[in-house]
């Protein structure tokens, strides 16, 4: 059997990886073997950090809510507010509540008073 030269196919694959790694620094954007290694590593980090980002934002929303609640003296703490929201079947998630708390804290005060009256 004759040897098959796969220059064009391999070049196309390397060119695709080179384009992906064009923003990397040093040899990570020039040498083929390190390009593939760093490309895999970058994709793994991106996958991991997408999940981490969700956790970080949830923590941020909870921290903001707790700070506003304690500052205004609405409730004793965040967990009691969330418990009463769920018991009264109010469908406001943490993201919306934290946006309300930052932009218009009086609205959050009205929501908490409504919960207390029920």
Swiss-Prot record:
Main location: plastid
Source superkingdom: Eukaryota
Pfam families: Ribosomal_L20
Compartments, record wording: Plastid
Keywords, sorted A to Z: Plastid, Ribonucleoprotein, Ribosomal protein, RNA-binding, rRNA-binding
Cited CDD domains: Ribosomal_L20
GO molecular function annotations of the record: rRNA binding; structural constituent of ribosome
InterPro entries attached to this UniProt entry: Ribosomal_bL20, RIBOSOMAL_L20_CS, Ribosomal_protein_bL20_C
GO CC annotation terms, alphabetical: plastid; ribonucleoprotein complex; ribosome
Gene Ontology terms: biological process: translation
Annotated function: Binds directly to 23S ribosomal RNA and is necessary for the in vitro assembly process of the 50S ribosomal subunit. It is not involved in the protein synthesizing functions of that subunit.
Protein family (similarity comment): Belongs to the bacterial ribosomal protein bL20 family.
Name recorded for this polypeptide: Large ribosomal subunit protein bL20c
Source species taxonomy: Eukaryota, Viridiplantae, Streptophyta, Embryophyta, Tracheophyta
């Amino acid at each position: 059997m004759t040897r098959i030269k796969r220059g064009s196919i391999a070049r196309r694959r390397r060119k695709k990886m080179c384009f992906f790694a064009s923003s990397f620094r040093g040899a990570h954007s020039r040498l083929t073997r390190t390009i593939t290694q760093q490309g895999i590593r970058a994709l793994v980090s991106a996958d991991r950090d997408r999940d981490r980002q969700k956790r970080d934002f949830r923590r941020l929303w909870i921290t903001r809510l707790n700070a506003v609640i304690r500052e205004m003296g609405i409730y004793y703490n965040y967990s009691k507010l969330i418990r009463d929201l769920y018991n009264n079947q109010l469908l406001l998630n943490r993201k919306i509540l934290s946006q309300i708390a930052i932009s218009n804290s009086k609205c959050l005060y009205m929501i908490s008073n409504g919960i207390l009256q029920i």
